[in-house]
Regions:
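Active-site- and interface-proximal helix/loop "cap" or "latch" segments in soluble metabolic
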Residues: 1-157, 203-305
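Long, positively charged binding patches that form subdomain-scale interaction surfaces
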Residues: 138-214
């Protein structure tokens, strides 16, 4: 997430996704799917231009739509089948809503006046929008009193020196930038075949004093039934969140246990709406709908060894 024209100009969302299979520990990953997107976001989180590596028909019909819940309906309307196929392209497009919502936080690290802008004051309709802003929340009081302070943590590079190919090539970002990074690792338990999921999610910004700081970070560990592909267990870990109330969201995730994985994109929104859940944990849970596709790719690769 960058602003090539500088402060208060068009936001660019440049996304990259990769599906890859590793057959054995130490093997190089086998890339089985990729996608890239570039989206221009104007005022009111409106899509002004959009391209993708696939050249998918229907993309241009998204121009004029806003990032937010209604964008998901537009994705289904203009790009039918992408959600059901769990494509890397869909994962990137689905993130337009969340990315356009949090992108501006990057400027709070560089411009002291940013947090006090009128557009950032808590409106009456923000109460109850998520578990952090539930009625009576201290986070609401902090924001109303003058912008409050987001709790952040300094974070190192995402790249693990012991597994340098664990991520696709990450873009070199300018100092004033925001990045949303997610991973979904899937394997079968060698003893009973249970599907094991380890997923991570991080929103971070460039910082003039600390290199990079994160404002949201979750890790999800889950299991699923190998025959029915239903969610058996889910254990979210809230590592970095902006307000004291936010970590309580981890206690809400159990309501989606028993859901078929490919139905998580809709079930999460139905059961964890507004103050029942956390917007960012919901994003992490919804992305697990891609697991059946990843599992099929894993099985196909292992079958050809």
């Amino acid at each position: 997430m960058t602003w090539p024209g500088g402060f208060d100009t068009q936001l660019r969302l440049d996304g990259s996704a990769r599906d890859a299979v590793t057959r054995e520990v130490g093997d190089a990953p086998i890339v089985v799917g990729t996608a890239t997107t570039s989206v221009g976001i104007g005022g009111n989180r409106t899509i002004e231009d959009i391209t993708a590596s696939s050249g998918r028909a229907g993309l241009s019909d998204l121009v004029g739509h806003r990032g937010g819940g209604y964008l998901r309906g537009a994705l289904d309307q203009f790009l039918p089948g992408e959600r059901e196929m769990g494509t890397p392209l869909y994962l990137l497009l689905d993130d337009i809503s969340g990315a356009s919502l949090i992108a501006g936080f990057a400027w709070s690290r560089w411009r002291d006046e940013w947090m006090g802008r009128p557009s950032l004051t808590i409106r009456p309709d923000m109460e109850g929008v998520c578990i952090g802003f539930a009625p009576g929340s201290g986070a609401l009081d902090e924001q109303r009193a003058g912008g409050g302070t987001h709790r952040v943590q300094i974070v190192p590079s995402l790249v693990n020196d012991a597994d340098p190919e664990g991520w696709h090539k990450l873009a070199d970002l300018p100092p004033t930038s925001m990045r949303r990074a997610r991973r979904i690792d899937v394997w079968r338990d060698p003893v009973d075949g249970t599907i094991v999921i380890d997923s991570g999610f991080q929103d971070s910004a460039g910082d003039p004093n600390h290199g990079r700081v994160a404002i949201h970070e979750y890790v999800l560990r889950a299991t699923a039934d190998p025959k029915t592909l239903t969610l058996l267990t889910v254990s979210p870990e809230a590592r970095i969140l902006p307000f004291r109330e936010c970590p309580s969201a981890v206690n809400t995730a159990s309501v989606v246990i028993g859901t078929q994985l490919d139905e998580l994109r809709t079930t999460v929104l139905q059961r964890l709406a507004r103050a029942e859940g956390c917007t960012h944990l919901n994003d992490a849970l919804r992305a697990l709908a891609e697991v059946p596709i990843l599992l099929a790719q894993l099985d196909a690769a292992l079958a050809t060894r």
